[in-house]
Amino acid sequence: MTNEIRKDAETRMDKCVEAFKNQISKIRTGRASPSILDGIQVEYYGSATPLRQVANVVVEDSRTLAITVFDRTLGPAVEKAIMASDLGLNPSSAGTVIRVPLPPLTEERRKDLIKVVRGEAEQGRVSVRNVRRDANDKLKALLKDKAISEDEERRAQDDVQKLTDNFIKKVDTALAEKEAELMEF
C-alpha cells in the first residue's frame, strides 16, 4: 500500500518537473530554438492551428530560425501570427522560406526573463510539495484506518520526503541551466 502511494507520488512529481522544464523551454534565450515558436497559432481555414501543424521550423544558424510553410498561401498568415505574438520577432519572407532572426537580448530583458524563470521554478517546487502533502495525507488516512503501523507510516513519509528533495533538486538544476543560458552573450 505504501509502495503504491510512493510510486504515485513519484510519477506525479516527475510530471511536475517535466511541466516546469516544458514551460521554461518556451522562454526565449539568445539562441535560436524551434520551441520558441511552439505557442504560436496560425489562422488556417477559419480556425487557429499550431504553427507546427502547418509549417516546418528548423534552426538555420545560432540566431535564425527558418520556417518552411506546407501551403504557400499560408506564408503571410504565418508572418502575421509571429508578429502578433509577444516574442518581439520580425519575420522576413524569402520565397518559400520565412526567416526569423532573433535579436540579441538586452541586459534588462535578460534580468526580466530570469525573474520569470525563477517564478516558474517556484511554481514547480510548490507543485512538487503539493504532491508530497497529498501523499502524506493518504499515509495518515491509512494509519487512521489502522491499515499500516506508525513505523510504516514514518518510513513511508521519509521516503516521500527523499523523493521531494530529489525532484526539487531537479527543478533547481533546470533553473540554474536556464539562468546560465540566459546570461550567455
From Swiss-Prot:
One of its GO terms (cellular component) is cytosol. Keywords: Cytoplasm, Protein biosynthesis. The keyword Protein biosynthesis applies. CDD domains: RRF (cd00520). InterPro entries: Ribosome_recyc_fac, Ribosome_recyc_fac_dom, RRF_sf. The keyword Cytoplasm applies. GO terms for biological process: cytoplasmic translational termination. It is found in: Cytoplasm. GO terms for molecular function: ribosomal large subunit binding. SUPFAM superfamilies: Ribosome recycling factor, RRF. Pfam families: RRF (PF01765). It comes from the Bacteria. Responsible for the release of ribosomes from messenger RNA at the termination of protein biosynthesis. May increase the efficiency of translation by recycling ribosomes from one round of translation to another. NCBIfam families: frr. This is Ribosome-recycling factor.
